[in-house]
């Protein structure tokens, strides 16, 4: 059995457990890289099934067969390890497509991808002026996601409270901090790719689906050559960059498609996407083999256990800043994928994410050979999850059906199977 070291910030404890089904896994979260470390990050990953929680990654790098970076924020470390001969699953320099938003726009232009109207705005005074003069725009933070997620400004009056809050938070950086402001794309449908990429190459099959923002996802296995043209066009344009970057990681795109069929790449995910990576881990039989081979620069095709997957995101506002106790019926434990998880003295906890208030604490998934089976399995598995202030958004997987029908009406084909109507599953 191969040995693997997972280096994470804490969000992908469930991925470490899944890899442990095929490998000897050690799990490391850096927590002492600051003057005043806290105990929370040092406890994330404690008690994971089949996983050894370690305090020092460097004593292990020469003992393991490959190293996995499921999240962004490690590109310098990943590149150093690769340059010294270590086998790495990770985005490396490719993560800049996700975190360096303005550089990503420049890269898209260089690669021949259409780019919608957007501006690089420096400083809060300039941002305020821009939002006063422009409506229906999205404000994005480049490089410092912990400050704020992307937010919409429909008009200045509605955005003003958020801008005032951000102005105060930035302190002395308020006049020099850069923002990327994107204008709304007049699109008819959203499309995207969900899978992985090894040195610019994509597997012959992948997951494709619809996300209900921050609540759920419905996906199906589809042949790569049957993906909608806008999805394949974007991947083909990005492939040379991904090859040059030595990209070996999961990969997702979010594309807005206009009435004329023009694909505007809005966002990329160069890590385990959430959603739908929790579905990969159970829908794909040979995940461990794919990751190990990818770390060695080789693409292995996925072996699918089921055709459809349904994912409901688990929320708890209590977990935003407090340790949240959780429990799962052992019969459904395989289908519940918590983030920032630890098990201490037999009790499971979600440990608050450092530096940001995050209410999304995990995913409840179901898989099946029909979409109805996957949705029903997701609903059944949700019955076995307990936690303080916890909600499993199973309603979102039903809502996603409407998005699927809209996509198919605009020639973004989800599946060759006939899809049920939302009302039939309520």
Predicted regions and their residues:
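ATP-binding N-terminal substructure of ATP-dependent carboxylate-amine bond-forming enzymes
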Residues: 1-93
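A structural signal for short, well-ordered beta-strand elements
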Residues: 47-53, 97, 119-120, 152, ...
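A conserved helix-loop-beta module that forms one wall/lid of the active-site cleft
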Residues: 91-157, 161-172
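Internal nucleotide-binding/catalytic subdomain
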Residues: 150-273
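Peripheral (often C-terminal) accessory segments that flank ATP-dependent C-N-forming ligase machineries
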Residues: 292-426
């Amino acid at each position: 059995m191969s040995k693997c070291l997972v280096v994470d910030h804490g969000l992908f404890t469930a991925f470490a457990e899944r890899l442990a089904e095929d490998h000897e896994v050690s799990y490391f979260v850096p927590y002492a890289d600051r003057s005043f470390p806290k105990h929370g990050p040092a406890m994330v990953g404690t008690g994971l099934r089949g996983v050894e929680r370690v305090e020092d990654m460097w004593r292990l790098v020469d003992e393991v067969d490959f190293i996995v970076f499921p999240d962004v924020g490690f590109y310098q470390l990943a590149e150093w390890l690769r340059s010294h001969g270590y086998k790495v699953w990770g985005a490396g320099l490719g993560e800049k497509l996700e975190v360096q938003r303005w550089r990503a726009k420049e890269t898209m232009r260089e690669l021949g991808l259409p780019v919608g109207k957007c501006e690089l705005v420096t400083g809060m005074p300039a941002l305020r002026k821009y939002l006063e003069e422009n409506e229906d725009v999205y404000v994005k933070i480049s490089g410092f996601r912990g400050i704020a997620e992307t937010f919409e400004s429909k008009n200045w009056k509605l955005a003003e409270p958020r801008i005032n809050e951000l102005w105060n938070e930035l302190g002395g950086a308020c006049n020099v901090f850069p923002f990327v402001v994107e204008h709304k794309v007049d699109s008819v449908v959203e499309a995207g790719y969900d899978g992985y990429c090894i040195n610019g190459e994509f597997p012959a099959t992948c997951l494709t689906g619809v996300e209900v923002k921050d609540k759920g996802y419905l996906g199906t296995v589809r042949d790569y050559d049957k993906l909608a043209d806008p999805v394949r066009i974007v991947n083909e344009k990005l492939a040379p960059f991904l090859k040059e970057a030595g990209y070996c990681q999961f990969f997702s795109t979010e594309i807005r498609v206009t009435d004329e069929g023009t694909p505007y790449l809005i966002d990329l995910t160069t890590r385990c996407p959430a959603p739908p990576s929790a579905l990969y881990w159970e829908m794909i039989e040979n995940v461990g083999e794919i990751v190990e081979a990818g770390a060695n620069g080789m693409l292995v095709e996925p072996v699918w256990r089921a055709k459809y997957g349904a994912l409901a995101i688990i929320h708890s506002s209590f977990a935003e800043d407090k340790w949240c106790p959780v429990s799962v019926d052992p019969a459904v434990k395989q289908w519940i994928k918590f983030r920032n998880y630890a098990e201490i003295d037999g009790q499971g906890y979600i440990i608050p994410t450092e530096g940001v208030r995050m209410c999304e604490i995990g995913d409840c998934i179901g898989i099946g050979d029909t979409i109805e089976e996957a949705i029903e399995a997701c609903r059944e598995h949700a019955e076995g999850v307990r936690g303080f202030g916890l909600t499993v958004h199973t309603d979102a997987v039903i809502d996603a059906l409407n998005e699927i029908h809209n996509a198919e009406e605009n020639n973004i084909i989800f599946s060759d199977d006939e899809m049920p109507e939302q009302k039939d599953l309520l």
